[in-house]
UniProtKB/Swiss-Prot annotation:
Protein's name in the database: Lectin-2
Lineage: Eukaryota, Metazoa, Porifera, Demospongiae, Heteroscleromorpha
Tissue distribution: Stored in spherulous cells in the sponge tissue.
Its biological purpose: Possesses D-galactose binding specificity.
GO-annotated molecular function: carbohydrate binding
Subunit organization: Homodimer.
UniProt keyword terms in alphabetical order: Lectin
Protein origin, superkingdom: Eukaryota
Length: 49
């Protein structure tokens, strides 16, 4: 369970980073955000037994 929690925390931090970059670098927001969400989704699927 702790491993899952760590992964989920990492996903949240990754998405927060993407949001920060989106706000501070609007011209490149699409690629950064999509990559972050793709990474997050892959991590979430890894949590499914």
């Amino acid at each position: 369970t702790s491993l899952c929690a760590e992964r989920q925390k990492y996903i949240v931090q990754n998405l927060e980073t993407a949001l920060y970059l989106t706000v501070n670098n609007p011209s490149g927001y699409a690629d950064v955000t999509l990559x972050a969400f793709d990474f997050g989704x892959n991590q979430l699927f890894x949590l499914i037994p």
